[in-house]
């Protein structure tokens, strides 16, 4: 066995990194493949906006012609400049069930970070900054769209190399027909009437685009205190927004307004994981057909953003937000709701959701090592 840095200027080398996960999970009924084109773009410094400010190296462990594992090493300079830190990230970690292969990959990650004069290593996180984590609970459930799935041995393999838990993210389930207490609707009505809260809805993707600058400013305000946050560039913002708009139904995007100011948000989308499985990682020639058909048929919805800005909490606006969520789910006839990756330290959000009888059923993890 040997570990090798890939020459990512070569398409064949990028494909070697990407193809490995399709081989590793090809017989797994719950794994949801990424789009190959998007995965390939992640490695392409000439196409992905991450490389306008930062850099990454990609490694594989090989035995003969066979790939046994892979890992990426990143220095996100935007993150380090924002936090005044010297942090490296590892990402896209995938490995066969062989602890020696995992040790080779993770030791390379440690060596790479030290060689680049960085003193902390966190992962898995990718070039977007919000992508990547390791599933540690809930292996019997298919992941929500864009959320990682992996084999159960990953957690032990990573800890074996000296990493410790950094942060856990919880995903929760609720039945689509769950009823909220009538008093919550009474509170929401009073808050709207007396305190100037309202719901902003969208009728088209173009209308959503017009609101993106305001929404991103609010996003930065709301997230800047989190240790995982960094301000994305305009190009990175476009990258994420364009990916979201490919799949989003505008009627599932809502803003809570306080007079003319954004006070909170609801971001939901149809879970088309089954369609992505049928597409096999390709949009063409028939991938779009499977995805669009599943979007029409699915009775699952993913909630991937739900919250209020700090200054509007405690004013009754949470009643406005959660009743709007319930009404949106009912209007679309969803039977199942997946609340995606809530930071375990976000106690306010967790408490609100537990009041709504959300049951936490999946757990993802980031790991950390300080040198």
In which residue ranges do the predicted regions lie?
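Generic start-of-chain signal for non-secretory N-termini
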Residues: 1-30
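A conserved beta-strand-loop-helix scaffold within acyl/acetyltransferase catalytic domains
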Residues: 21-63, 71-81, 207-306
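Catalytic cores of nucleotide-enabled group-transfer and carboxylate-activating enzymes in metabolic
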Residues: 34-37, 43-44, 52-60, 68-70, ...
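Short, well-ordered beta-strand micro-motif
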Residues: 60-62, 171-175, 255-257, 366-370
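Acyl-donor binding region in acyl/amide transferases
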Residues: 80-162, 279-355
């Amino acid at each position: 066995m040997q570990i090798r840095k890939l020459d990512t200027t070569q398409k064949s080398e990028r494909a070697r990194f990407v193809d490995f996960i399709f081989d590793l999970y090809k017989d797994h009924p719950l794994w949801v493949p990424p789009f190959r084109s998007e995965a390939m773009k992640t490695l392409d410094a000439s196409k992905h906006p991450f490389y306008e400010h930062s850099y990454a190296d990609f490694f594989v462990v090989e035995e003969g012609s066979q790939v046994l594992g892979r890992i990426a090493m990143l220095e996100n300079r935007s993150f380090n400049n924002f936090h005044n830190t010297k942090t490296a990230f590892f990402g896209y970690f995938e490995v066969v069930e062989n602890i020696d292969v995992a040790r080779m990959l993770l030791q390379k990650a440690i060596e790479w970070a030290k060689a680049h004069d960085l003193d902390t290593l966190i992962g898995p996180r990718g070039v977007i900054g919000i992508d990547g984590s390791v599933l540690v609970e809930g292996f019997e459930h298919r992941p929500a769209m864009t959320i990682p799935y992996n084999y159960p041995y990953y957690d032990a393999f990573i800890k074996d190399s000296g990493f410790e838990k950094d942060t856990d993210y919880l995903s929760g389930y609720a039945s689509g027909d769950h009823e909220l207490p009538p008093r919550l609707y009474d509170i929401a009505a009073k808050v709207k009437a007396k305190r100037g809260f309202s719901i902003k809805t969208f009728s088209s993707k173009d209308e959503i685009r017009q609101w993106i600058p305001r929404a991103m400013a609010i996003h930065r305000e709301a997230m800047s205190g989190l240790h995982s946050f960094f301000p994305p560039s305009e190009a990175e913002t476009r990258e994420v927004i364009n990916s979201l708009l490919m799949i989003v139904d505008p009627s599932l995007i809502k803003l809570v307004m306080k007079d003319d100011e954004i006070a909170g948000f609801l971001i939901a989308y149809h879970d088309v994981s089954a369609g992505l499985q049928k597409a096999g990682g390709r949009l063409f020639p028939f991938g779009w057909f499977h995805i669009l058909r599943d979007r029409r048929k699915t009775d699952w919805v993913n909630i991937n953003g739900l919250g209020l800005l700090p200054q509007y909490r405690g004013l009754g606006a949470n009643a406005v937000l959660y009743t709007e969520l319930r009404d949106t789910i009912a209007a679309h006839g969803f039977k199942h709701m997946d609340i995606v990756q809530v930071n375990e330290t976000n106690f306010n959000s967790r408490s609100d959701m537990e009041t709504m009888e959300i049951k936490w059923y999946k757990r993802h993890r980031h790991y950390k090592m300080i040198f």
